[in-house]
Amino acid sequence: MNGTEGPNFYVPFSNITGVVRSPFEQPQYYLAEPWQFSMLAAYMFLLIVLGFPINFLTLYVTVQHKKLRTPLNYILLNLAVADLFMVFGGFTTTLYTSLHGYFVFGPTGCNLEGFFATLGGEIGLWSLVVLAIERYVVVCKPMSNFRFGENHAIMGVAFTWVMALACAAPPLVGWSRYIPEGMQCSCGIDYYTLKPEVNNESFVIYMFVVHFTIPMIVIFFCYGQLVFTVKEAAAQQQESATTQKAEKEVTRMVIIMVIFFLICWLPYASVAMYIFTHQGSNFGPIFMTLPAFFAKTASIYNPIIYIMMNKQFRNCMLTSLCCGKNPLGDDEASATASKTETSQVAPA
């Protein structure tokens, strides 16, 4: 084995020279230079500075403006809430531990940090699944008279939390475990060991199949059908130009969210699967640290995409920030089709 396994950790460094210490007790500067830990802390500080205001602003603007409280926006707000969980439950912890060079909060703190990071990521993934299904039902109309309403949105939000908890909670109760990963300053699922005492192998397989592969299949199926339907409707002119444009804009926004999710999380998932299927292979702490920390950027890209691609929300945000006055004037604010309201478009 090219790493050192302890009772509640796995350090990707051989202990032949006897330098390996518990990541809960002493700085891990034998894994990387102190300045590299400082860089991680600076990166986490940047994510906190960007992630908290932009996600809080998303919630605040939606609460302040009643016209933004549409069923589709419930799912988008769910993403903002999940991102705030990651900021407060994960990023602040990782910032502090990176400054100290090891996970100073012990195994209990590791469980909490790993839980919040996993919970936030899974809520994001399952929210994209719900959005994909919503787009499929609204645009493709497999049920001709179906309208995506408030009750459906609430059920969708509840579903994302149930599925996310089904992934994030088991390591807290004995099925797998959370351990420090990479440079030992943040925690995640144990992909490094089989750990039969906690049935680690079965949990990792369950997680990759149920909480990554199946959601991806659903998302790609829905958008494959959706692209075909949009092209067909455009060719046959089955709906008004305004409706088609609104549907396309919402669909484009959600597809971009999916693409950014894959950009953020696919490297982490790929490296985790490689480590799990090549246990005992030689890899350094940076190998897992970079994708793990890069995945954390997911907390800021969704609200940015939402603000940039949703004209109605952008105008409401400017109105809130400018004390009730929109500096762009009333013309843009009264633009016809709101992208977040297209989930209520009746079937043609």
Swiss-Prot record:
Disulfide bond entries: 110-187
An MF annotation (GO) of this entry: spectrin binding
Residue(s) carrying Phosphoserine: 334, 338, 343
InterPro entries reported in the protein's UniProt record: GPCR_opsins, GPCR_Rhodpsn, GPCR_Rhodpsn_7TM, Opsin, Retinal_BS, Rhodopsin, Rhodopsin_N
Residues the record lists as N-acetylmethionine modifications: 1
Extracellular side: 1-36, 97-110, 174-202, 275-286
Site (Plays an important role in the conformation switch to the active conformation): 113
Sequence motif 'Ionic lock' involved in activated form stabilization, location on chain: 134-136
Cytoplasmic-facing ranges: 62-73, 134-152, 225-252, 309-348
Sequence segments annotated as region (Interaction with SAG): 330-348
Biological process according to GO: absorption of visible light; cellular response to light stimulus; detection of light stimulus; detection of temperature stimulus involved in thermoception; G protein-coupled opsin signaling pathway; G protein-coupled receptor signaling pathway; gene expression; microtubule cytoskeleton organization
Source organism, top-level taxon: Eukaryota
Function: Photoreceptor required for image-forming vision at low light intensity. Required for photoreceptor cell viability after birth. Light-induced isomerization of 11-cis to all-trans retinal triggers a conformational change that activates signaling via G-proteins. Subsequent receptor phosphorylation mediates displacement of the bound G-protein alpha subunit by the arrestin SAG and terminates signaling.
Entry protein name: Rhodopsin
Organism: Rattus norvegicus
Gene: Rho
